[in-house]
Regions:
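Conserved S/T- and glycine-rich ATP-binding loop of Class I adenylate-forming
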Residues: 45, 62, 169, 175-178
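Short, intrinsically disordered, charge-balanced linker/junction segments flanking boundaries
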Residues: 188-195
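N-lobe entry segment of adenylate-forming
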Residues: 1-18, 25, 29, 116, ...
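Conserved AMP-binding/adenylate-forming core of the ANL superfamily
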Residues: 4-59, 145-151, 190
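Solvent-exposed alpha-helix faces
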Residues: 28-32, 86, 180
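Conserved pre-ATP/AMP-binding loop-to-beta segment of ANL
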Residues: 3, 126-129, 140-174, 181, ...
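Short acidic loop-to-helix transition motifs that present clustered carboxylates
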Residues: 54-55, 75-80, 193
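Structural core segment of the AMP-binding/adenylate-forming
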Residues: 64-151
Length: 195
């Protein structure tokens, strides 16, 4: 029952306390969902989400399966996201329908769709957490190519961790690109775990 972390959003007036047990359950079930979509050790995922608990679930689920993930800042325009899609060739993009800042809404899913169209590489899956925010609800009936994050998590079985070498790539972090195109810096699992 110990609290793992507290999600506190003054913009949406939401406070959520997540225990270590809840975190482990959500992460292992979401990992099972990713496995059911065909993802496995050595694959790559892009996580393009606001700072919500589901982003942490996605990152940890990828790590649990040996899927190298790249978290892309939600403030980036579709063109910047497309550059990262082409560079790391993800099998899946994990996103949210929208994000909120103090005085504006960030349309994550429309940005992902635009980046998808721009990119030469086409990820096999787009998993969307529907935040059900004003004007940015997901039209699941008319967009069958999208996978519902919450349904995937709820219907999936928990899976165990996949063993990886200490040198296995954990995540890719892109440089700012001040002197040209952003470059992906790969952090390995062992180095990150011991840092």
């Amino acid at each position: 029952d110990q609290i793992a972390y507290i999600y506190d959003s003054p913009v949406t007036d939401t406070i959520q306390k997540i225990t270590f047990k809840e975190l482990q359950e959500n992460v292992s079930k979401f990992a099972g969902g990713l496995q059911s979509l065909g993802l496995k050790k050595g694959d790559t995922a892009i996580i393009y989400m606001p700072m919500i608990p589901q982003a942490a679930y996605a990152m940890l689920a990828c790590a649990r399966l040996g899927i190298t993930h790249s978290v892309v800042f939600g403030g980036f325009a579709p063109h910047e996201l497309a550059i990262r899609i082409e560079d790391c060739n993800p099998k899946v993009i994990i996103t949210a329908s929208a994000g909120v800042e103090v005085k504006k809404r960030i349309p994550y899913l429309p940005f992902v769709k635009e980046a998808y169209e721009m990119s030469a590489h086409k990820p096999e899956n787009i998993v969307v957490f529907d935040r059900q925010l004003w004007g940015n609800k997901v039209d699941w009936e008319n967009e069958p190519q999208l996978t519902n994050f919450q349904e995937l998590l709820e219907k999936s079985e928990s899976v165990d961790c996949v063993p990886v070498a200490s040198t296995h790539p954990l995540y890719i972090l892109y440089t700012s690109g001040t002197t040209g195109k952003p470059k992906g810096v790969i952090r390995d699992t062992g180095g990150y775990a011991t840092a």
